[in-house]
Amino acid sequence: MKRIKLTVAYDGTNYHGWQVQPNADTIEGELNKAISELTGEQIEVIGASRTDAGVHALGNVAVFDTESRIPGEKFSHALNQRLPDDIIIQKSEEVDRDFHPRYQECRKTYEYTILNRRFPLPEYRNTAHFDYGNLDIEAMKKACKAFIGEHDFAGFCSAGAQVKTTVRTIYSLEVECMELGGVQRENHAEKKTECEKISYDVNIKTGEEQENNRLVNIKVDEERENNRLVNIKVDGGQENNRLIKIRVNGNGFLYNMVRIIAGTLLEVGKGNVAPEQMEDIIKSADRKEAGPTAPAKGLKLVEIRYV
């Protein structure tokens, strides 16, 4: 009997999470079926992280015991021939029989992706949370500092979680912003004449649902001749068109903890919570003080590194 470790990547869109459930498609269920078919044994894998419905992974870990004579490193190719296209074994290897993916000391890295622009993009519909607000990235980065270190994260855990302790250590928490490119809105009419030029800024409160009734600054350049308007140039400014990634590394995470961290940082970005409040929110250990749980589709388990 030998123990095989699998590094698993998957798109969680079409699955009811990792853990086997009756009458539901799950990642664990698909792995059990493929491995059992390959080995001729009744296999049940043990997973490191039981991700929720809609959550994705680049490097979740699972193990199973088998008497198969297939070399450990060969399982990845053989299983990928049997698994659906949205589940891929990145690596397979034989490990010590006492290796346990859930109880072994490790560091986990998660990433939460936000598409920040006026309208959604179809290619990100299953892998990023869409937010059209004018998010303050610097404020979000500043708020990250309060999370670093060992804290009681009871306020960042969904109700019903059964754990011995809510104390966890976060080694790093970063907010990265990648511009996708912008669209400059500009309307103007021109007339060649000697005239007075006037520039001023106008704040317009939009009524469009997509703009969330927020104030939008517009720059206006007027040209006047004998107090008569002969030319006007309106510059609507640069629309947000970016991907924001919240990346966190820690020794373990409570139920929905990363999604609640992401939801809280979004509240900071929107100006609803000041970065300076974050330390008190964590110390309160009160779920009501933290932000909402961000949607599952933006979350991805990037890596589990055993130490």
Could you say what each language-model-derived stretch is?
Residues D221-E222, D235:
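Repetitive helical segments and hydrophobic/amphipathic motifs
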Residues M1-G207, L215, L229-V307:
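Structured-RNA-binding interfaces characteristic of tRNA pseudouridine synthases
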